[in-house]
């Protein structure tokens, strides 16, 4: 399950909010907030984690932020480490999907497998 994090927040409390339990989440953002992107992304992510209590999420893959957002690897790590709900969830950052180039299309509702070792392998299985 995945998509734009701001849109997920707009769906919270509606019948259209997808069930995130036992799912791999693919999350990205459009970067319209520019230099305050990391603060807004942090807040939007926390809102989503409060909704699902961070339980039973299999993994989260974050799409790479646009350059104007000035989102560094250090900022990603800081946001992730400050979320106790994410402590035991595998996380991938800077994946090539979302509002950036190059872009990978990810089928929503499909099945995927993630392997974490020397490399991170993401395989769409169905």
For each predicted feature, which ranges?
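ATP/nucleoside-binding phosphotransfer catalytic cores, i.e., glycine-rich phosphate-binding loops
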Residues: 64-126
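Solvent-exposed alpha-helices and their adjacent loops that cap or buttress functional pockets
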Residues: 17-19, 53, 84, 105-106
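Glycine-rich anion-binding loop/nest that anchors nucleotide
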Residues: 26-30, 61-66
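Short amphipathic alpha-helical segments
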Residues: 43, 55, 75-79
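ATP/pyrophosphate-binding catalytic subdomain of soluble kinases
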Residues: 1-46
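Phosphate/pyrophosphate-binding loops at sites that engage ATP/ADP/AMP, CoA/4′-phosphopantetheine
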Residues: 48-58
